Amino acid sequence: SKYGLQFHWTSESQPRYGKQKVYADAVRAFDVQSFAQMVNQTGAGYIIFTTSHAEHYFPAPIKSIDAIMPGRTSDRDLVQDLIGALGAYGIRLMLYYHVGHDHWVEPDGWWTRTGFAPDNPNVFISNWCAIMTEIGERYGEGLAGWFYDDGCVYYPLNPDFRQLGQAAKAGNSSRVICYNPWIWPRFTDFQDYFCGEGYGFLNNHEWLPKNGSGIFTDGPHKYLRAHTN
């Protein structure tokens, strides 16, 4: 695809009119048919849809998340519904994912429950892999990719990116993944594309020749497919 769209829709999103719904109710009310029709009218070939950001929630009944902290999922499987509605137009679905952290105003205990501990990150990494494996196997080829944000949070934990990648590609070995390094060089070779935060100049970049393959020919992101958001 030449281009896609990214949508930031989370537990903190507000409706245009009326009061904010409880997350599960907002997921239940999401009109996927109208959404897919709108995306199709833009000509986009794929979308990146935000799942968790800031607060850790996920719009589907994922047992591994419920086991960590109940009340962070939904009974409706919005991801599957998006795959179906977008797929009717030939549009692929990718998901944005943030490992989550406590709410900055009212800490809710997510980081403690998920095992985030810089001195012993094994529980945190194990939980992340369990969540990714369940989600990946649930959606298979319907889930085309992952955009993992905020690499500055988990890179200092020295995770095994090969292990994370295997979990990320569960159910679909062709699923593309990236770990957002912000403005820093890439964190690992075990990824498929460059997230592109702050890379608005990609069209004129010396390492991305015009009419080329779209893959960096040199520099800190050499061999990664270029992407910007």
What are these regions (language model features)?
Residues S1-N229:
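Mature catalytic domains of secreted/periplasmic carbohydrate-active enzymes
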